[in-house]
UniProtKB/Swiss-Prot annotation:
Gene Ontology CC: one annotated term: amyloplast
Organism: Hordeum vulgare
A Gene Ontology BP annotation from the UniProt entry: glycogen biosynthetic process
Pathway the protein takes part in: Glycan biosynthesis; starch biosynthesis
Stored CDD domains: ADP_Glucose_PP (cd02508), LbH_G1P_AT_C (cd04651)
PANTHER family for the chain: GLUCOSE-1-PHOSPHATE ADENYLYLTRANSFERASE LARGE SUBUNIT 1, CHLOROPLASTIC-RELATED, GLUCOSE-1-PHOSPHATE ADENYLYLTRANSFERASE-RELATED
EC number: 2.7.7.27
Upper classification of the organism: Eukaryota, Viridiplantae, Streptophyta, Embryophyta, Tracheophyta
Listed name of the protein: Glucose-1-phosphate adenylyltransferase large subunit 1, chloroplastic/amyloplastic
Location within or outside the cell: Plastid, Chloroplast; Plastid, Amyloplast
Keyword hit for Signal: no
Key word Plastid present: yes
Catalytic activity: alpha-D-glucose 1-phosphate + ATP + H(+) = ADP-alpha-D-glucose + diphosphate
First and last residues of the transit peptide: 1-49
UniProt-listed Pfam families: LbH_GLGC, NTP_transferase
Amino acid sequence: MSSMQFSSVLPLEGKACVSPVRREGSACERLKIGDSSSIRHERASRRMCNGGARGPAATGAQCVLTSDASPADTLVLRTSFRRNYADPNEVAAVILGGGTGTQLFPLTSTRATPAVPIGGCYRLIDIPMSNCFNSGINKIFVMTQFNSASLNRHIHRTYLGGGINFTDGSVEVLAATQMPGEAAGWFRGTADAVRKFIWVLEDYYKHKSIEHILILSGDQLYRMDYMELVQKHVDDNADITLSCAPVGESRASEYGLVKFDSSGRVIQFSEKPKGDDLEAMKVDTSFLNFAIDDPAKYPYIASMGVYVFKRDVLLNLLKSRYAELHDFGSEILPRALHDHNVQAYVFTDYWEDIGTIRSFFDANMALCEQPPKFEFYDPKTPFFTSPRYLPPTKSDKCRIKEAIISHGCFLRECKIEHSIIGVRSRLNSGSELKNAMMMGADSYETEDEISRLMSEGKVPIGVGENTKISNCIIDMNARIGRDVVISNKEGVQEADRPEEGYYIRSGIVVIQKNATIKDGTVV
C-alpha cells in the first residue's frame, strides 16, 4: 500500500471533499468501528469528528473514509496542530494623538487632530476607540501632545464617564511630558511617542497578561475587527504585522508602500516613494478579485499605519536595537523586516486616511451619498461618541436632499443638499447649503440673546438669512451673517485670510472656529 492516497473527507455538514491523507506516522491513527449499523456508525463517526461537546477545534480530529476500506472502516486524523486563538485580553492598544496637525490646519488650530469633528456628531478619535471596543479590546492608551484640551475633554465625557463597561480594562490618556535629565522636545515621531512612555507600558504589563501591542492612528475613517488582524499575527507567529490596503496611482505616494511574498511576509517597505521608487513598488493585485471590483485600478499596497507587535519585540526595538530612531514607517519598519518576521494583513473594506483638508472634506461628503461607501450606523458594531442629551432637530418648510442632519438643530425655510449639519446648528430663512460641512455649535443662544445681538448689529451663531454656501467647511460656533455668498467662484486654491475669518485649502473654503463673517460678505 502506498504511503499517500486521496480519500473522501466527511465534514460536519456531510458533504464529501477530496483531501490527501497520510496513512503512516504519528499524524493519524486508523480506528476500526465494529459491525454496527450504518446509522449508528455515522453517528459515532460524527461524534468522533465533533470531539464530543468540545468540538473539532479541541480534539484536532478529522474523519475520513478511505477508498480501500469497508463502510465500517473509519480513519481518524488526530493532528498535532491546535490553533492558538488570539485573546483580546492579551492585547493592549496604543492610539497616537498625532503631531501639530499642519495638514488639517486651520481645523487643528485649537484642537488635536483626533478631536476634529466628523460625520455630524462624532470625533476622529471615536473611530479607533469604537473599533477597539467592538473588537473586545478594552486596554487602551491614548497619547496626546498638541492642543489636547478638547480631546481630553471628549475622551473623559465619552469613555470615562461610566457609559462603557470596561470590566478589567481601562482608558488612559498619556500627555506629552519630560523626564528629569531628558532633552527637551516634543515627540519626534510615532515610535518616539511610544518610547517616551515605555516605562508606563512596562509597568502596566507586569500586572496584566499583555502579549501583543496594537498601534493605531487617530486620523482615519474605517470599521475593522482588530482581532482578525491579531489572529493572523498569531497564526503567522509574526513579530510584526502591518495592516495594509490597496490604493490607486493618484494617492500612492502619500503612503508607506509594501511588497510581500506568497506567504504574506513583507519583503520591501518604502515610505512615501516618488518617481522610479514609486514605480518599483507596483504589485499585481489580481489576487484581490474576490474582494474589490477591478483591482487593476489599485496597483499598490499601502500600510494603513495600523501595526501589531509582539510585546517583547516592540520593547526591544524601541529600547535597544533602534533606540535612536523615531518613526515606525520611515525608519524602524524598513529595517526590522530584514531580521524579523514582518507579515502583511490586507484590509479590503472602506478605509480613508484623513490626512489633508481635501481628504477630510471628500470623506465627509461621501457619507452623504446614497448608498454611502461607509456607514456610521451598524447594530453589531456601533460607533460611540459623547452623549449630549439634545432634543430632536426641528425643521420648517425646508428642502433637504442627500444630507446628514444631527440632533438639536433649528432649520427654517432653508435648502440643504449633499451636506452635513452638525449638532445645534441654526439655519435661517432663505439660506442654502450645498456640498458643505457645518460642524455646529458647543452651546445654544436663546431667542433673547439672538434678538439682542441683531439689534446691536452683531451676528448670532449659525447661518443668516439668504446666505448661499457651497464647497465649504464651517467650523464650530461660526457666525455667518445675512446675504453672504461663500463659493470661491474664482477658484482660488490656497489663501490665508484669518483677519476675515477664513482660509482656503485645495479650493475648499474653511471658516474658522468662532469666526464672524459679516453681512453681505462674498468669498
